[in-house]
A protein has these predicted regions:
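RNA pseudouridine synthases
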Residues: 2-168, 196-215, 219-244, 334
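Accessory RNA 3′-end/elbow-binding domains used by RNA modification enzymes
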Residues: 1-19, 25-42, 46, 50, ...
Length: 350
């Protein structure tokens, strides 16, 4: 376990491969016990049924988390066509059921294509979005699901990998969660998922933060006229952090792998090198002259050649946070350039 000179767990990121059945907060609680500190948070909530990459910050790295959630994400998912649920996933109650066995691969691909690009997405009613100070899921559980407004999201790719008949016993709402006829009065498909009634669609999605894969499943089903919900979800990447660097909770219990703060910032953000004078000023909350683009951005000194993601791309001053490093490779702050001035978003020293 990496610790600082005072014997405390070192500041940094822990990339967890979250198991199904745990909330993101459950994972944070486990990491708090493993790290011996309460200063732990996570970036980008995963639903309990979902598995995969959950980025957890420890100590000073918790200040990175609010900015990491702005990055794009990748998922592998299975969508069940022929049943809609009140939550948009397999943990909900079936609200409608229609035969989907007649659908072709081309039709499913067309529905996915229509949900690709910059779209307006209505979040699921059972979500953590706040409505007049309360979470939407709380209102939904009380029998008054809120009407949520569409939000702009970007789906860079929505790839259909396979379309297959749903198998009996495969993940989905329990057969007893809905009658055979759909509540909306349509004849409906059997909730048991009889032969030809239901289709499972395996997809890969790359999307912006804030995109609900449950909503993509719902909207695909609606577009095809049969309803749809999510039966499995695995997040394979958040920004630069993929499954290859993720560790299970059991693995972390054996060895707590912490990505050091400076290295984590260099991987997640473009890098700006500072003079000693600039580093001192910024560490005390001072502002710096802006660069007006990518000039001066590149590899972080003393980080083994790690390069920030903005090194090769010409960045505008509105591109997002930049990691500012002192000449000795110490991460000083995240900065944002606006109107020709770079101001600190989060300072990490002293």
């Amino acid at each position: 376990m990496a610790r600082d000179t005072g014997g405390n767990v070192a500041s940094g990121l822990i990339v967890v491969d979250k198991p199904g059945g745990l909330t993101s907060h459950d994972v944070v609680a486990r990491v708090r016990r493993l790290a011996g500190t309460r200063r732990v948070g996570h970036a980008g909530t995963l639903d309990p049924m979902a598995t995969g990459v959950l980025v957890v910050g420890v100590e000073k790295a918790t200040r990175l988390l609010g900015h990491l959630t702005l990055t794009d994400k990748e998922y592998q998912a299975t969508i069940r066509l022929g049943q809609a649920t009140d939550t948009g996933d397999a943990e909900g109650t079936i609200t409608s059921a229609r035969p989907a066995g007649h659908l072709t691969l081309a039709q499913v691909q067309a529905a996915a294509a229509a949900l690709t690009g910059e779209i307006q997405q209505v979040p699921p009613a059972v979500s953590a979005i706040k409505v007049k100070g309360r979470r939407a899921y709380q209102l939904a559980r009380e029998g008054t699901p809120p009407v949520l407004e569409p939000r702009p999201v970007t789906v860079w790719s929505f790839t259909v990998q396979a379309v297959r008949p749903a198998q009996a016993g495969s993940p989905g709402p329990s057969p007893g969660s809905s009658p055979g006829a759909a509540p909306d009065g349509s004849p409906g498909a059997s909730p048991d998922g009889g032969p030809g009634d239901l289709l499972d669609v395996d997809v890969e999605v790359r999307c912006s933060s804030g995109t609900y894969i449950r909503a993509l499943a719902r909207d695909m089903g609606d577009a095809l006229g049969v309803g749809g919900h999510l039966t499995s979800l695995r997040r394979t990447r958040v920004g630069p952090y993929g499954l290859s660097v993720a560790r299970t909770l059991d693995e972390l219990a054996s060895e707590l792998t912490v990505l050091p703060l400076a290295e984590a910032a260099a991987e997640a953000f473009p890098v700006r090198h500072l003079t000693a004078e600039q580093a001192n000023s910024l560490s005390h909350g001072g502002r710096l002259p802006g660069l007006g683009g990518a000039a001066g951005l590149g590899e972080a000194a003393g980080l083994g050649g790690a390069a920030g993601p903005g090194e090769a791309a010409g960045l505008s001053e509105t591109a997002g946070p930049v990691a500012a490093f002192a000449p000795d490779g110490t991460l000083i702050a995240l900065i944002q350039e606006e109107d020709g001035v770079a101001r600190p978003l989060a300072v990490f020293v002293p």
